[in-house]
Amino acid sequence: MSPTFFIHTFGCQMNMADTEIVTAILVEGGFAPAEDEGTADMVLLNTCAVRANAVDRAGNVLSHLKGMKRRRKGLVVGLLGCVPQYEREQLFGDFPFVDFIVGPDNYRDLCGIVRSVREGEQRRAFIDYDQQETYAGIDPIRANRVSTFLPVMRGCNNHCAFCVVPVTRGRERSVAFDRVIAEVAALEQAGYREVTLLGQNVNSWCDADKSLDFAGLLEGVSHAAPSMRIRFTTSHPKDISESLVRVIGERPNLCKHIHLPVQSGSSRMLDLMKRGHTREEYLDKIAMIRELVPGVAITTDLIAGFCTETEVDHRETLSLMEAVGYDTAFMFYYSVRPGTWAARNLPDDVPEAVKKARLQEIIDLQTAMSRELYQREIGKVVEVLAEAESKRSASQLMGRTSENRAVVFSREHFMPGDLVPVRITAATSATLSGEALVQPSNP
């Protein structure tokens, strides 16, 4: 019988995509997925190091696995992803029951690593950087049959003051244009209805000779899979070009949603964060986007309480939120990440209580803006890609609009994968509800 494995995944979409790659590598190597950790011969944690709370959540699962390993002789526990690359061999001191740690560039070696551990080899760390690794040639085992992820680049060269990604993921490297086009076309042929192109800084993608930028890739992908919805994330404001935005506005299967992290509305804070743009430059990009892509939804990331942030800086963040009118936002208060420029050079001098209070103001404002925006959708007919059965009721489906707005609607005869016109009848700050109108569009 094949040894079995179960993977806990934390963090971003790239980690989710990496879990699908790891699953494919293990299955090809003779391992089999388990239904849950309780029946698995090996439990892996694919970890995130971007924020302290993500590391803490992985630590809580590890504490649970420590007891499980005492009770189950032969259980193998491994750590994958950004935390091993970030904390390195120190993890063995913190979690002595962990059998191995593997960084994001070393997954091809995973089967051999596991077999060595099962044969009694001592704990080891596999955390070398490989600036060529994009996992080309590996066909991921995908968890979703409607919408999926496709990494088109890895790493980041920006070195924002607060961010560990350049430490955990290394420098930027792009998947070749022809390979991306072939993979997207294969996904369309396999019946997928939507793909999200992924990168830590996806719009800095370029071909090997730098003759083609992300706008060219996005246009090529759009033509290669005309029946699929195409999304991308995450973007850096300084790399959002007019040519890229024009492609989004012109191509009908490119989703009208751009995630554009700003982090702060204060130019002083943006300079300290090493973001490479000012408040005014960001707002100019927003104006250009809204002009070229009417009805576009813009979402963002926001950090409250970064080093030396004053009440004036915080108020500038609130006013920028109002000026942009974000659909939604990922909102956090600042936590120091050792190894970053900010950790080495700036004081973490905003009291935690102040950070939390400012974060709550940001959340309250965004919730109110989202509710107002979603309320304006009531009465409209929107096209929804049905993704799955609603978690609340088997009689409902859940899906998303081109603008990435979540919609719950009556199931009727529709199935996941259908494109369904839905009349919106109700809204909260996070979800639209509605009634399906006609036959699905499903070529």
Swiss-Prot record:
The record's remark on the cofactor is:
Binds 2 [4Fe-4S] clusters. One cluster is coordinated with 3 cysteines and an exchangeable S-adenosyl-L-methionine.
Q: What is catalyzed by this enzyme?
A: N(6)-dimethylallyladenosine(37) in tRNA + (sulfur carrier)-SH + AH2 + 2 S-adenosyl-L-methionine = 2-methylsulfanyl-N(6)-dimethylallyladenosine(37) in tRNA + (sulfur carrier)-H + 5'-deoxyadenosine + L-methionine + A + S-adenosyl-L-homocysteine + 2 H(+)
Which positions fall inside the MTTase N-terminal domain?
A: 3-119
Cofactor(s) needed by this chain? [4Fe-4S] cluster
Keyword flag Cell cycle: no
Q: Which Gene3D superfamilies match?
A: Methylthiotransferase, N-terminal domain, tm_1862 like domain
Give the primary localization class. Answer: cytoplasm
Would you tell me the protein name for this molecule?
A: tRNA-2-methylthio-N(6)-dimethylallyladenosine synthase
Q: Which organism is it from?
A: Chlorobaculum parvum (strain DSM 263 / NCIMB 8327) (Chlorobium vibrioforme subsp. thiosulfatophilum)
Gene designation per UniProt = miaB
